[in-house]
């Protein structure tokens, strides 16, 4: 028996398939989901979700959201999500550099919060792409 997983972001369905395992970047740490997992709802932090299909893990960058597990179905709604294989590594590295520069030089609290979020997003994207 497999898990049915569907990952949606505001502009698209990112992933919709049957898989053997899901590892979520929950707000309380990494959370592994296998078949017949107890029902749950959890918040997701910026990070890399991994889904295992036929022995291979597929990395997916996830930027905050929520996941629900029930009856061997995993539903993820994220602010943004992107398959690791589709990430523009150069663009993510440039975003990381900009965020690091802002964090090092800015005194504005709003800019610092935005830069911290941008840093987390760039790190998640680079990890999902296998570049970190």
UniProtKB/Swiss-Prot annotation:
Tree of life domain: Bacteria
One GO cellular component term: proton-transporting ATP synthase complex
InterPro entries given in the database record: ATP_F1_dsu/esu_C_sf, ATP_synth_F1_dsu/esu, ATP_synth_F1_dsu/esu_N, ATP_synth_F1_esu_C, ATPsynth_dsu/esu_N
Subcellular location: Cell inner membrane
Listed CDD domains: F1-ATPase_delta (cd12152)
GO molecular function: ATP binding; proton-transporting ATP synthase activity, rotational mechanism
Main location group: membrane
HAMAP family: ATP_synth_epsil_bac
Protein name: ATP synthase epsilon chain
